[in-house]
Amino acid sequence: MKAAPPTSLQALIEALRVLPGVGPKSAQRMAYHLLQHDREGARKLGDALRGAADHIRHCARCNTFTEQEICETCLDDRRDGSILCVVETPADQIMIEQTLTYRGKYFVLMGRLSPLDGIGPKEIHLDRLLARATDTEMGGPVGEVIVATNFTSEGEATAHYIGEMLKARGLKVSRLARGVPVGGELEYVDAGTIARAVMDRRNL
């Protein structure tokens, strides 16, 4: 009879597999490492995951992660409310913030269009983006929307869809310049390249 890990250990391995890029073997190595070498780290990890899952929500205006109803960026009156930058993920938002060149507001899609995966306009909250860009109660109307989706095929398709949707409402829409490589994702691009792409953005 084949020996199996204890039930609680197997549950940990399966839980670790939800992480991107983590397969069965990687999850098993992580689980064994935590239990063999870093029990205190394992407890801290569990507490941090539980705390984040219980307290992190989506900002009512920009859809990013926050512990409040409205995030600090949206509440910051020093930022330029006439410019709205649309990104795929909170990680992309952080990358643009690190350039120290953009002082407008954001909207975070939490994804990108991918019909083959069942991800359409509703799943990436384009109805909320439209409201954010045009509704005065949500902080609109804005003077310009910068589409900063990634330069993957899905990101380009998402940018095109957003551009057509917002231009139909009379809004100015621009796209990051091609300083970001084709197929590139903002999360993995250096801050200087992103800064140049923002400054050299082009109209859609």
From Swiss-Prot:
Pfam families: RecR_C, RecR_HhH, RecR_ZnF, Toprim_4. The gene is recR. A zinc finger (C4-type) spans 59-74. GO terms for biological process: DNA recombination; DNA repair. Signal peptide: none annotated. Belongs to the RecR family. CDD domains: TOPRIM_recR. Keywords: DNA damage, DNA recombination, DNA repair, Metal-binding, Zinc, Zinc-finger. This is Recombination protein RecR. Residues 82-181 form the Toprim domain. May play a role in DNA repair. It seems to be involved in an RecBC-independent recombinational process of DNA repair. It may act with RecF and RecO. The keyword Zinc-finger applies. It comes from Cupriavidus pinatubonensis (strain JMP 134 / LMG 1197). HAMAP family: RecR. Gene3D superfamilies: 3.40.1360.10, 6.10.250.240, RecR Domain 1. InterPro entries: DNA_Rcmb_RecR (IPR000093), Rcmb_RecR (IPR023627), Rcmb_RecR_Znf (IPR015967), TOPRIM_dom (IPR006171), TOPRIM_RecR (IPR034137). GO terms for molecular function: DNA binding; zinc ion binding. It comes from the Bacteria.
